[in-house]
Amino acid sequence: RIVFKKKNKTKFKIKTICVGNFYLGGTGKTSLSIKINNILKKKKIKSCFIKKYYKNQTDEQKILQNNGKLFMSYNRIDALKSAEKENYDVAILDDGLQDKTIDYDISFVCFNDINWVGNGMTIPAGPLRENIYNLKNYGHIFINGNLDNINNLKKETLKINSSINIHLGKYKPTNLGEFENNCNYLIFSGIGNHKTFVSMIKKSSLKILKDIEFPDHYNYTKKDIDEILDEANSLNCEIITTEKDFQRIKDFKESKIKVLKAELNIIDEDKLINLII
C-alpha cells in the first residue's frame, strides 16, 4: 500500500533499499543486493528483489531469482506494489538510483575501485550517469574490488561529502577447490568489472595465460564459444568464466567451461547490518 507522495516521489509502506550507481556497469550492485538479502533472511526479515525489466539483463535477473524472490516490471512502482501485496517487509532495488519517482528509505551509490569514476565525465563524454559531485546528495557509498587504492578513494569521496558513510567490500572465490593450481587457464567474461575478475583470480594463485574481455551483458553466440574452446585447446588451457556469463552460455551445454563462483565480503558487516535492519 502506498503511504503518500512527496515532491512527485512515491513513498511506500514497504522499506525500500536502493542499490544503484553513477558509473555505467560493473559496480557490484547485484552482489551487494544479494548480500543485503542474505543478511535480512538470517534476521528472519521477509525481503525481496525489485528490478526494472530490461531484455539484455537476463543474466542478472536469473542470478537474483536464484537467490530470492524477484519482482520485475517495466515500471519499478508496479513491482513494488506487487511486493507489498505479498506482504514483504523490505524491497531491495537492484539499480534505480536515477529513478526519481520513488522516495527510497536507504540508497547506496556503488563503485568499483578499479574503474572508479573513469574519466570523471558524464554520458556521453564519459561513463557517469550523474556528476560525481552529486555524491553530496547521498548518505551512503559502497566501494568494492581489491581495495588497493582505497585510502585515496576515501579522501576523494570525503572532499565531496564529508558526512557520507563509506562501506567497503571484497570479492572472495567460494569454489577454489574445484580448480588445480598447476593448470594454466584462459578466462573470459562479459561483465562491467572484468579487471576485478582477473585480479581476484590472480590473487587466488591460479595462472592466467590469456584473458578475453567482452562487452557488459554480451550475448554470446555458438561461434564465440567455439572460438574460445579452440583458443584454449591451442594453449592447452582450462577455461574459467563468471556466474553471470554462465547464465548466458549454459544453453550451449559446454562442459569444458568452468565457473568461478564468488561472494562479496563486507568489511565491517555489523555497520551495514545496523543500517538496514
Predicted regions and their residues:
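Short, polar loop motifs at secondary-structure junctions
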Residues: 95-98, 146-147, 172-174, 242-248
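A short, acidic, amphipathic alpha-helical segment used as a generic capping/interface helix at domain edges
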Residues: 219-237, 244-246
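Short, flexible loop segments at boundaries between secondary-structure elements
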Residues: 215-218, 256-277
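Redox- and metal-dependent alpha/beta enzyme cores, enriched for Fe-S-associated oxidoreductases
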Residues: 178-222
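Walker A (P-loop) phosphate-binding motif
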Residues: 2-56
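Structural motif
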Residues: 16-18, 92, 108-110, 142, ...
